[in-house]
Curated annotation (Swiss-Prot):
SUPFAM superfamilies: Thiolase-like. It comes from the Bacteria. This is Mycobacterial beta-ketoacyl-[acyl-carrier-protein] synthase III. Residues 259-263 are annotated as: ACP-binding. The gene is fabH. Homodimer. Belongs to the thiolase-like superfamily. FabH family.
Amino acid sequence: MKQIAATSGPTNIGLLSVGSYRPQRVVTNDELCQNIDSSDEWIYSRTGIKTRRFAARDESTASMATEAGREAIAKAGLEASDIDCVVVATSTHFLQTPACGPAVAAALGATGVPAFDISAGCAGFGYALGVAADMVRGGTAGKVLVLGSEKLSPTVDMTDRSNCFIFADGAAGVVVGETPTQGIGPTVWGSDGTQATAIRQDIDWMDYLDRPTGPRPFLRLEGSAVFRWAAFEMGKVGQQAMDAAGVRPDEIDVFLPHQANSRINEILAKSLELRPDAVIANDIEHTGNTSAASIPLAMAEVLATGAAKAGDLALLIGYGAGLSYTAQVVRLPPG
């Protein structure tokens, strides 16, 4: 019987670079408090957020992803023609079709390559990174551009005191390719659909079309439920990722959790028993929660500020809508 040929790729892969894009407009807590009964102190004490970035009207998920991708490609010392695949993690590409990925690939000049979106909420970047890593190891792509890009500000009800101060906009991403030593550990991922309503769009699009003069859809969040789930369940996921990578907690140099809430991140760091001197990303303070963009944005920030350096061992944990989660151990790329 004729055998179908198989593909195989390199054993050792890693992150070749990281690129980011942050919109120019900085939005303070005080500005948001003009629409709600709250204060800068109250918001900061409960979330760790002081400011966040909102994209301009003419900026889109695709345009921000393109800027972040352009920087990531340049920092890797590559040309767009060297990229074999583009994966965009997003939940805020405001077209049902076509996907964001092909437009980003075309804008970058990566012509003819596979390009697609992954929608897994705030865990999206980790999902996309897991898919990209498997593609390179499997030999179906040599270099994959993985992007997280979100424009969440239009999805938020600015009179909703429970979450209008949480979400924000931005994009960042990495190039995945062959490296001399192993730079990406196995992906640990999963979901809990029984809690799907904890982070949700409150009105179905078909229901909205039936009542176009009624209230429009918004993003809603059951903050207490998500806090409990993330703070007390995601530590187990992080430990599983370290076990899968053959790494001990005291060997982790940098902790890069999804930037949802600084209090959650502090609880996770303690439960994971990381070293006291391990760097804990806190990009949320001035960036807010950018969903699928938050982990690569935080990665870019710790490298740019010198808090971390290339080659440091980092634990990534993403979690959010679905509810979905993911974790990996990686070596940080050059900043």
